[in-house]
């Protein structure tokens, strides 16, 4: 049975990658493949139980709300624009190293904010505009988060 579950998992990962490359809706692909995998492994409620358990954590909601609030205040006060102008010139000479540096910064922020949505809100409000202004393509900058 464990071998069957492993095979289902590998096929599910391959199917997910295939549909994402074909530009299918990300959320639909992930929930669909997850539900199909849980049904095939004879645990149809397993995926939903894990999702519900992770969403009911009070710390998760607080982290997401505070990060979204931070991003909104940065945008509303236009601090993000000023930060971009301040950092663009010094960072434009580091084009080759900007992606690894941004990845490392995001990793360290993700330690403090364990939620992916909260981390993306906190880092995306500042790093993506900085990367775009420094010459990194928008699609590449958006893939970091």
Curated annotation (Swiss-Prot):
GTP-binding keyword on record: no
Transmembrane spans: 1-21, 28-48, 54-74, 96-116
InterPro entries the UniProt entry points to: C4_dicarb_anaerob_car (IPR004669)
Subcellular location: Cell membrane
UniProt entry tagged with the keyword Isomerase: no
Disulphide-bonded residues: none
GO terms for MF: C4-dicarboxylate transmembrane transporter activity
GO cellular component annotations of the record: plasma membrane
Key words, A-Z: Cell membrane, Membrane, Transmembrane, Transmembrane helix
Mode of membrane association: Multi-pass membrane protein
Family to which this protein belongs: Belongs to the DcuC/DcuD transporter (TC 2.A.61) family.
Record's protein name: Putative uncharacterized transporter HI_0586
Organism, as annotated: Haemophilus influenzae (strain ATCC 51907 / DSM 11121 / KW20 / Rd)
